[in-house]
Amino acid sequence: MIQKNSRLVVADNSGAKEVLVIGILGGTRRRYANIGDVVVVAVKSGSGGTVKKHDVLKGVIVRSKSGIRHENGSYIKFYDNALVLLKEDLSIIGTRIFGPVVRELGKKFSKIVSLAQLVL
């Protein structure tokens, strides 16, 4: 579960390395976000690219330490919390996705699943 003030790793090549969650979209009193949810983030560190430090963007969570339950009953947990940065129209900024993602993302964000190195 990701909440406000959580720091996440960026899993694409947009130029940002680490972000801070400043809002969770989808309700007025929403406290937690899971895999597939859209959050508002502030860039905390980066390597210079499309995205600069202190930019405020949207992102979709692709990996979480708390994990996700598949339809067949199995659970998948990851070693880090990661997200992919999005533009205002919810299209991805980067052109590559690093690390594994879950196949449940394909329902809303099929582009992320098609660019991912490994789909679980």
Swiss-Prot record:
InterPro entries: Ribosomal_uL14, Ribosomal_uL14_bac-type, Ribosomal_uL14_CS, Ribosomal_uL14_sf. Gene3D superfamilies: Ribosomal protein L14. Keywords: Ribonucleoprotein, Ribosomal protein, RNA-binding, rRNA-binding. GO terms for molecular function: large ribosomal subunit rRNA binding; structural constituent of ribosome. GO terms for cellular component: cytosolic large ribosomal subunit. This is Large ribosomal subunit protein uL14. The keyword Electron transport does not apply. Belongs to the universal ribosomal protein uL14 family. Pfam families: Ribosomal_L14. Part of the 50S ribosomal subunit. Forms a cluster with proteins L3 and L19. In the 70S ribosome, L14 and L19 interact and together make contacts with the 16S rRNA in bridges B5 and B8. Binds to 23S rRNA. Forms part of two intersubunit bridges in the 70S ribosome. GO terms for biological process: translation. The keyword Cell division does not apply. NCBIfam families: rplN_bact.
